[in-house]
Amino acid sequence: MHTPLEQQEIRYRKGDIIELTITDHAEKDKCFGKTTEGMGVMVSGILAPGDRVSAQIYKVKSRYLEARAIEVLEASPDRVEPVCPVFGSCGGCKWMHVSYEAQLRYKHKKVTDSLEHIGGFESPDVRPVLAAPDALHYRNKVEFSCSNMRYLLQSEIDSDQLAKPKTFALGFHAPGNFEKVLDLDTCYLAKECMNRVLNVLRDFAIERGLEPYAAKAHEGYLRNLMLRYSERHEQLMVNIVTSWYDKALMQALKERLEAAMPEQQMTLLNNVTTRKNTVATGEQEYVISGDGYVTERLGDLDFRISANSFFQTNTRQAETLYDQIIAVGGITPEDTVYDLYCGTGTITLYLARHCKQAIGIEVVESAVKDAEMNAELNGLSNTVFFQADLKNFHAMQEALEPYAKPRIIVTDPPRAGMHPKALDTMLKLQPERIVYVSCNPDNLARDGKEIAARGYRMTSAQPVDMFPQTNHIETVACFERAE
């Protein structure tokens, strides 16, 4: 007796070629679809929901397959031509191949899915994503790396002709490769003046025979180029990270930059490090020209930003984000507001103009000092900053004893979300309202589930797109204590 075809088990093997339609995004930059038989497939490649693709299976699991896309047979209507010629080789942008409208739609779905599936929130009020005014050239900070191993483009490998020397590169690390760097002339997320510095430094380094850093051998002079730009004050910071200090060389670079960009207000720094890593910071800092910092304006506040300070990388959208905190939090002039994970105090100070007192809490001592300096710079007397570990409730309680209890708490934790003990500390303070600022929808959902279990209800979630062309999304979620 023969088993009907529809009842026979379909057996997939490694190396099989399958066809499927991409239906959604998945973790680790993969996409998801199903075979005609209904088997789920995680597909690697530069894809978009709506793409019809052929893919080769490389791993067979009991409940799903993993495959690599071979060819897009029918393109998604969301697709556009990427403006960057090295998109796909550079790891900076993940979604430049789809329209900005589609990016916003994907991000809204990601926030909604996380809150529903991880947080257990039924039909959460996820508002339309607040789009960035500029989808390109929006970053106020960019870090470029220098290497003696240039990442070769596939076109060079196929033609067996090098477009540039293999032993010098200044640009971004190739995805998953800490040694090789993709040499760039232009980053389409960086400001125009940043790209000009990138090319001036490359020409200067090659002319002078400066040795690029070799990460594996821990040899070489030129390591990184870190740039910051103040949109409101039009100031540019150029920070060169090297393995040792060469005063004459830095002076020559200063003169080259000033000759190439005579109208640009600029400060030049040299961070020096002997560490065996590729991080763009140094143990020593030399100010070659200018003040050694830039000043940026958010709203009616000025913030002094040094080479290694944290500051939101999208100035215009940072204002949008902070305005949303005030709006969804319902902050009034009579309120005492606590700002957890306050860093250098940007949110705390932004809130201070709208409430009676704003108290910032941060574990990093240097960040607290920067926050206090920024409060003084702006003449704010209703702010207080504490260096404290949020995981220690009793120490927190003792430090905050002289101050009014908060009606509202704002928390802006790192990407990993709140430590369980820090979350417990926040909930023990029993604010009427919690405004949770998150750059990771999954961890917002995880922490939000615990907040809801402790007597709060989520009233809204407002996504804000801080990073166009990428799959990252910021969200401002509001939780109110149930009566």
UniProtKB/Swiss-Prot annotation:
Tell me which residues make up the TRAM domain.
Answer: 11-71
Annotated residues that bind [4Fe-4S] cluster are located at 84, 90, 93, 187
Q: Does the keyword Lipid biosynthesis apply?
A: no
Q: Which Pfam families match?
A: TRAM, tRNA_U5-meth_tr
| Gene Ontology BP terms | rRNA base methylation
Q: Which terms are listed as keywords in the entry?
A: 4Fe-4S, Iron, Iron-sulfur, Metal-binding, Methyltransferase, S-adenosyl-L-methionine, Transferase
PROSITE patterns in the record, alphabetically? SAM_MT_RNA_M5U, TRAM, TRMA_1, TRMA_2
Binding annotation for S-adenosyl-L-methionine: 312, 341, 362, 412
Enzyme Commission number(s) from the entry: 2.1.1.-
Q: What class of enzyme is it?
A: transferase
- Looking at the keywords, is Iron-sulfur present? yes
Q: Which residues catalyse the reaction?
A: 439 (nucleophile)
Annotated GO molecular function terms are: 4 iron, 4 sulfur cluster binding; metal ion binding; rRNA (uridine-C5-)-methyltransferase activity
Q: Which family does it belong to?
A: Belongs to the class I-like SAM-binding methyltransferase superfamily. RNA M5U methyltransferase family.
Name it: Uncharacterized RNA methyltransferase CT0009
